[in-house]
UniProtKB/Swiss-Prot annotation:
Coiled coil location: none
Residues in the DNA-binding region annotation: 27-47
Protein EC: 3.4.21.88
Function: Represses a number of genes involved in the response to DNA damage (SOS response), including recA and lexA. In the presence of single-stranded DNA, RecA interacts with LexA causing an autocatalytic cleavage which disrupts the DNA-binding part of LexA, leading to derepression of the SOS regulon and eventually DNA repair.
Gene behind the chain: lexA
GO function term, MF aspect, one: DNA binding
Name the UniProt record assigns to this protein: LexA repressor
InterPro entries on file: LexA, LexA-like, LexA/Signal_pep-like_sf, LexA_DNA-bd_dom, LexA_repressor, Peptidase_S24_LexA, Peptidase_S24_S26A/B/C, WH-like_DNA-bd_sf
């Protein structure tokens, strides 16, 4: 998808408006921001962006613009040192799954590596649907970060101690010392996908 410089500017404006207002801009707002003579010029640029697959236009709505990259769920691969888990450099494409199929809704997919959770049916290569949150209840399966390593384990808190429990007797629990390692809960498991899933990008 090759965009002209102007199309890229408009796409960036749509993204920034979504981040600030929580909604896409109107044609009038785009025209005003870029000094177009009328909203029709903005409409022409939007149609060009839609034709190139960067956005989806929803007729009948003044703010009926949807970013294609918002469709589906991002797959997180290896997590770059020091980066947020949803940083662009960690993403390995997007998959055609509706986030609202999960409760609470899924924010990303994580490819499972290893056999530490096989006793609860989570196998190497599965896609784990994860709701991004730093809050988790005792006993929930979490995606946790220990320094720069991301792991999937069951959370257990007892006597002021945090333990990450594997669901495989071959693996010892991980006892977390927050003084010694950089520990953070990145999310909770809300579903599991195994088998063919359509990739969007």
């Amino acid at each position: 998808m090759k965009l002209t410089p102007r199309q890229q500017e408009i796409l960036d404006f749509i993204k920034s408006t979504l981040e600030v207002l929580g909604a896409p801009p109107t044609r009038m707002e785009i025209s005003s921001a870029f000094g177009f003579a009328s909203p029709n010029a903005a409409e022409d640029h939007l149609k060009a962006l839609a034709k190139k697959g960067a956005i989806v236009l929803e007729p009948g709505s003044a703010r009926g613009i949807r970013l294609v990259e918002q469709l589906g769920l991002p797959l997180i691969g290896s997590v770059a040192a020091g980066s947020p888990i949803l940083a662009v450099e960690n993403m390995q494409g997007r998959y055609a799954l509706d986030a609202s199929l999960f409760a609470p809704k899924a924010d990303f997919l994580l490819k499972v590596r290893g056999l530490s959770m096989i006793d609860v049916g989570i196998f190497d290569g599965d896609l784990l649907a994860v709701h991004k949150t730093n809050q988790a209840r005792d006993g929930q399966i979490v995606v946790a970060r220990l320094d720069e390593e991301v792991t999937v384990k069951r959370l257990e808190r007892s006597g002021g101690q945090i333990r990450l429990i594997a669901e495989n007797p071959d693996f010892e629990p991980i006892i977390v010392d927050p003084e010694a390692v950089d520990f953070a809960i990145e999310g909770i498991a809300v579903g599991l996908i195994r088998g063919a899933v359509s990739k969007l990008s």
